[in-house]
Amino acid sequence: MSKKGQVTVFMVLGFISLLVFGIIVGIRSYSQEQSVGSSQEQILEASQFAVPVKSYVESCLEKTGEEAIVFIGEHGGYYKLPKLSEPQLELPYYFYDNISYLLTKEELEKQLSNYIDNELFFCLGNFGIFKRQGYNIKQGDVSTITKVTENKVKFEVNLPVEVAGGTTLSSLDSFSTSISSRLGTIYDMVQKLMNEQVQNPGSICVGCITIWGIKRDLRTEMYYL
């Protein structure tokens, strides 16, 4: 399944300069299956019993993961904006008073994880669709680990789920989705630009932005406010 979304990365320079460059990011997701079982005697039955629930969780993880990448990209890498930000534009300051405030890649990954931890619940809907069919389902808390690479974002989610029906009980806990995204490439370019800005705080290297964008096949737009 292919989807396209637009991710826009914003950079605020000093008190009055806002540099924005927009990136079109293709998003394509696929879920990686996890093995499920309860006991040697019931492993086939339990696995078949849990398949629809497992597929449902993975579908929600895929959808929420795509939404996370778009939302984070449109808000400068943040799920929750830091104090040093522009409230009206809902964007963080990356460069302020000659100091770089660009978040680290680890912090970016944490922001994505926080999005999944808080938003996956809404897609799952407390498994109401299954409970109405007679399933007895209990779920624990969501805990996500995110890894951003050059062309991919991988979400690994721990979500304890117990599925019961009749005499069969099945447990699930591990789910993962890899989403094709150039978020890592975008971040690397922003980091390169911030390093340039720290070395030359009195000016903006417009030529650098253009050249680096072309080399990475990224479309850039710049605005001054």
Spans of features found by a protein language model:
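Long, compositionally biased, intrinsically disordered regions
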Residues: F10-L225
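N-terminal leader/signal peptides at the extreme start of proteins
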Residues: M1-K4
